[in-house]
Structures are given as structure tokens and as C-alpha cells.
Amino acid sequence: MKHITKKLLLSAIALLPAWAVGQVPANSTDVMLQGFYWNSQKLTGWAQLEQMAGDIAKDFTLVWLPPSASAEGGGPVGGNNVGYHPRQWNNQNSNWGTADQLKSLITTLHNDGVRVIADVVINHRAGDTDWGNFTADDFGSYGSYRLTAANICSTDEMNTDPSAGKWNGMATGAPDTGENWGGARDLDHTSSLVQADCEAYLNWLKGEYGYDGWRYDFCKGFGGKYVGIYNDASSPYLSVGEMWDGSYDVVAEWIEATGRKSMAFDFPSKYAAFNNGLAKGNYGSMSWQEDNSTWRPAGMIHHHNYRGLAVTFVDNHDTYRDDNKYTGDVPQAYAFLLASPGVPCVFYPHWTQYRRFISPQIDARRRTGITSESDVVVTQHSGYYESISTGTKGKLLCRIGAAAPKDVPTGYRLGCSGDGWAYYVSEETPSGISQTLYDKNEDSTLYDLSGREVKKDAKGFVISSDGRKMLK
């Protein structure tokens, strides 16, 4: 894969330390759960997630929640309004649950050691009862604001769509700084009022509800520099933007536009490594050369300037419901994801269906000390994928593919494995089983690091299916 503008872009920042600016955790050991999917309100609403908080905390340090503001269309708790057309920012009653249930969920997750990421939709906003009559934003001590048609981009369809009726031509804000979003009003982020409103909103979410960080929706819709401004004002633990583009250069340019003050979802990795790579048995697509030298896992994570600024994922609520969905072997995909740098984000349906594989993979990542900035080298093979990740506690060798060797490499021991994938951890890696014995979803059977069934004998020893005693 060629990156035409990458060299020019990197030369401009070559003298900067990787973490010179921004609210981005360095050498992060975080693993994130996307705690919802499209129309999962009855399964992953606030009340349901709170009941799962203990299990979530066994695997994850971050949970990304869906949009929690009252949205266009309204509806009851458990209804099918996902929330991506927010109507009233200071009303946190949604189809996902009530404001009180949201506060309770976040408190419970915090008590279990899990930080919470809000899905922030500020590119666009729905009118209260019509095209452009926004509700007032009363954030109490954080400030009160009211946006009008003067705060809507002049390029919004409200000025061109005849069905806007009396609102047609009334949007008098500056031209959009990004792509237009049809169906809701594009906010003019050059406006000082819009900026003040957004900053108050974020600080209110943080102060009143306990959110720790932000996932910015539809970042193609407004300039990246505004994300930097909003992060400076709200100081999130972690910020990640949905810059939905498979181009390395496009995502890198957006990160730079924020002032390197936000991470970005690694869509280049999603498409190269998963959709066009592993799903098609094209192992060569799963790695890129860093500066025409060392082979690394494909995506933003292939380069040292961006791997610590990437949130990697296999699927999300959007890609999972159309032809962007990953169609290959899911445990194999997470073997790649959890052996790679960046902050990995696990999709809720994948976690619940394949937890007996994903949990041991997460545990192996933690036991070897793999971080968002870890050095990972890919060795080239025509019929399988192989990488070695160097963590703070040991090394993790990952093999994916039916043709991959099954022997245990010298200096390593088997960490965990499944159909067509295996993790080997270096001998110096701390041993023992941690967060790896759990209830399988469909029954109460226990499994070990390698997915083998285990049980206890009369003396309390855990016995694997091959008869070996493992622990007491």
C-alpha cells in the first residue's frame, strides 16, 4: 500500500515527541468494550448493563456507551431510537434508560474500575418540533445556551430543501467545515456560541454524570481542530473520533488537525487487515511496511507516530449491519486485534458469543504487558500471519491461519489457542491463570486459557479435559 502524502505529513511532526500534546493516554493498557449495537436497547440498556458490570470489569477497563441525550422521535425506554439525532442535550432520558439509571450505571462501572466513554453527537442536531427550533440548553452551573438558525451552517439542506417550508433559507451560519449530514441540522462550529454550548455540554456530562471520555460521532462533518478545542475545554481521559475512511492519510490528517489531541478509530486496519485481509485469506494484506522497512500490523497501528493514537476494532454498530461487516472467523480476528498496538475495542455481540476465546486473548495481552504503543513485528509468510509483540512483561507470538506451524517456538509456551489461531507467550511472562475461568454463555461449563473444558476434583484442584491438574 502506498501513502503518497504520508512522508510530507510525517516530516512536519518528526521533531515532536509522540505525546507532546493532547488528552491521549500514553502506553495505554486499556481494552474497551463497545457496550451496544444497533437497536439493542432491550439487551444493553442502562439497567441491563449495570447487571453485567462485574463481568464487564473482568475483561475491560473502558466501556463505550451509545448516545444518551434525548433524541428526535422520542419513545419509551427500550424503544428503537438509537439516539444519533439528538434533540435536547440537557435531557439524558433516552430509549436506553432514564437519567437516573445512567448515573447509577456509571457509578457502578466506576466502582468496578471501569471508565465510561460517552457517544457525543455534536456535528448535527434535530429541531424540537420543526427544522430549526432548538431546545434551550440549561446546564445549571455550567451555563445556559440556546442555538438558533443563525448557528446552522449555510450549506445545510434547510436552505435548499423546499420541504423546509418557512425555515427554507433561514440558516445563516458559516459554510460547513466538513461534509453535510442530511436529516438533521449541521451546526456551525466556527460560531463562538456553538463552541461555548458544546464545551458546557461536555463538562456537564463529565461533572454531573461522571463520563470519563468522548467518542465523537461523524467527524467527517466538522473540522478536526474543533475536537481539539473541545478536548482542551473538557480534559477527557480518552477521546476518539469516528473518522470513517479507509485511507491512512485521511485519518492521519484528521488526527493532526485535532492537534494530536484525540485518538481515531483505525478504519484503515478494519478494511486492510480484516475485511480485505483475514476474511479473504489474504494474509499479505494484514501487514504494512513502516517507512519501507519493518513489517507491522496493517492500519494506523503500523507506524510509530500513530499506533498510540489508534483505537482498533473488528466491527461496530454501523459496519455490523451492512456490507462493511467482517465476514471471516471472529476469534481469529481478535487474535490479531489483541496482539497489536493501539487501544483494542471489542464489539458487544462478538464478546458475548466468543467470550471463551476473547477473554483468554485479553488476559494474554495483559500478562505480557502489551500496550497501545508496543513494538510489533510481522514476519512474512504466504499462507499464514505471524507477529511478535514486545510487552513490558514478556513477548506474545501470534499465529493465524490453518497453515501456521503448530509447534511451540523455543523460548515460548502456549498461552491460548483456538481453531486456526494460537498465542505463545515468552518464558519470562508471569504464569498463572488470571481472568480466564468463567461461565460460558450457554451453560455453566468452565474453560481454561486454551478453551479446554475444566472441572474440580474432590481435593479442589482444577482439572483440564486432558487430565492435567492446573490450580487449587
Regions found by a protein language model. Name each.
Residues 1-23:
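Bacterial Sec-dependent N-terminal signal peptides
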Residues 1-5, 461-472:
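C-terminal tail/sorting-segment detector
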Residues 23-45, 180-186, 191:
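Boundary/entry segment of secreted carbohydrate-active catalytic domains
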Residues 24-34, 38, 51-57, 66-69, ...:
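Active-site-proximal helices and loops of the catalytic beta/alpha 8
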Residues 28-30, 71-107, 136-188:
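Aromatic- and acidic-residue-enriched carbohydrate-binding clefts of CAZyme catalytic domains
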Residues 97-130, 134-138:
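Substrate-binding cleft of carbohydrate-active enzyme catalytic domains
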Residues 428-450:
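Residue-level detector of functionally pivotal "anchor" positions at catalytic/ligand-binding pockets or at interdomain
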